[in-house]
Amino acid sequence: MNHILSDRINNLATSQTLAMAALARELKAQGKDIISLSLGEPDFNTPDFIKAAAKKAIDDNYSTYSPVDGYQDLKEAICRKFKRDNGLDYKPSQIVVSTGAKQSLYNIAQVMLNDGDEVILPAPYWVSYFEIVKLSGGVPVEVPTSVETDFKITPEQLEAAITPKTKMMWFSSPCNPSGSVYSREELTALAKVLEKHPNIYVVADEIYEHINFSGTFCSIGSIPGMLEKTITVNGVAKAFAMTGYRIGYIGAPEFIAKACTKIQGQVTSGANSVAQRATITAVDADPSVLNEMVQAFHGRRDLVVGLLKEIPGVKINVPEGAFYVFPDVSSFFGKTLKGHEIKDANDVSMYLLAEANVATVTGDAFGNPNCIRFSYATSNDILTEALRRIKEALTA
């Protein structure tokens, strides 16, 4: 019945992370002992002080529509957060609160892109960037990076990718899926390229900023001359273990913020009222409240990287943030493992599911055909068992 559906939906790829997670759940329901490392979701509970704020909001009868762009006091709190944590000076009129950072990104693409506008995507990138750009009429321009360069785009690569049709560059730091974190020096070098192209805007996805093991974090918008051409995207899902609250937000030039409010008013209107009230408490909190969770992720990172380095043929960078590893498995291409012909990263991912009962995600979904991604947002015991299975399968 695809001929009845729109070309738009027929040309839209299914989210590979969600698809693999669904397949893992299906196999588990069949009684298989599946370890799913496919989804990026903290395995911690929302902090009690945030849950208390949500309960209070219910008792205070926050049960009606909010303003389309979010409650004024929440936008003021987000401005304080941007100033405190990122050195970014925004006014409440430059803030738009949405139903998750994914909607924030979709709003941006819809209001910024005309048909044929090019968007530079340093690869690997988060799975939805590519499809969101396509859905909005834009043309994704992938710039490949590799494990040898810590999966970071260089100024030379950025300059070479720019054409008269370039409208934007989208990137995340810390990066999903590679965990790479750009330093101030690296971002300054990219900014020097962009300052020669005043009509190119940057989307800086900083959803993982607090899950950062490097000791420092820099927002590209804090570099002189960049705030006016940067749209900073963030949210509370990852750092505060609030994935189900569905709150994301942007700080942007005011004309872009107004445009995002305009389109959101025709799609979802304001985000969940109770979740917004809880978010005020989250963004006003000192980041030190997250130390225990961040330290746990740091320890898991070290465990997983150490175990992966024991597997012959696997190459890996050391992720400095987020909660993913993105190993290069290209040395297995062209081999046959336990009767499975391995041609690409997707074959590796499916082989590990079939033979190791471990769900990962192919790097193709993130714009890198040589890698697979898995999340270490689970316990050390589960990670140790998963890596034991992976090692056994890949050394067969």
Question: Which residues does each predicted region cover?
Answer:
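A glycine-/small-polar-enriched, mobile loop at the entrance of the PLP active site in fold-type I
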Residues: S38-E41, K56-L74
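Conserved N-terminal alpha-helix of the aminotransferase class I/II PLP-enzyme fold
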Residues: Y65-S98
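PLP-dependent class I/II
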Residues: H3-L5, I9, A13-S15, M20-L23, ...
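Glycine-rich phosphate-binding segment of PLP-dependent enzymes
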Residues: T46-Y65, R84
